[in-house]
């Protein structure tokens, strides 16, 4: 995942900067304490849902990656949305598909999941 930023309300933009986040698509949430949370689907093994938190929205530390789930059977997952239901309590919604079934190529079963978690569990 790459990021760009603007210091002038979008009139100009920085060059793209790589982040340590290996996934997409991202969803950004400003937490009640001012930090920025990015939730995303990891579409490479181990497949699942991840989160990173940044103090400033510019620097991201891979060591701070939080694994919400790593049990997805394939890369068809993601589109997370996170909300802070109260300070420090996060609810993240996303979709995952079941494992590919070669006997039923038209099986498009999809499930919407949620993970309720506490920031304090990872700090």
Model-inferred region functions:
Residues 1-123:
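Asp-box/BNR beta-propeller blade signature and adjacent active/binding-site loops
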């Amino acid at each position: 995942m790459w990021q760009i930023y603007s210091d002038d309300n979008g009139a100009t933009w920085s060059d793209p900067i790589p982040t340590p986040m290996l996934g997409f698509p991202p969803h950004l949430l400003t937490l009640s304490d001012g930090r920025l949370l990015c939730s995303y689907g990891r579409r490479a093994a181990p497949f699942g849902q991840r989160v990173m938190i940044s103090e400033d929205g510019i620097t991201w530390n891979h060591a701070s990656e939080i694994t919400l789930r790593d049990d997805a059977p394939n890369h068809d997952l993601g589109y997370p949305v996170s909300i802070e239901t109260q300070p420090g309590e996060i609810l993240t919604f996303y979709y995952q598909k079941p494992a590919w079934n070669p006997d039923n190529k038209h099986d498009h079963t999809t499930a919407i999941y949620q993970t309720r978690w506490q920031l304090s569990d990872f700090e």
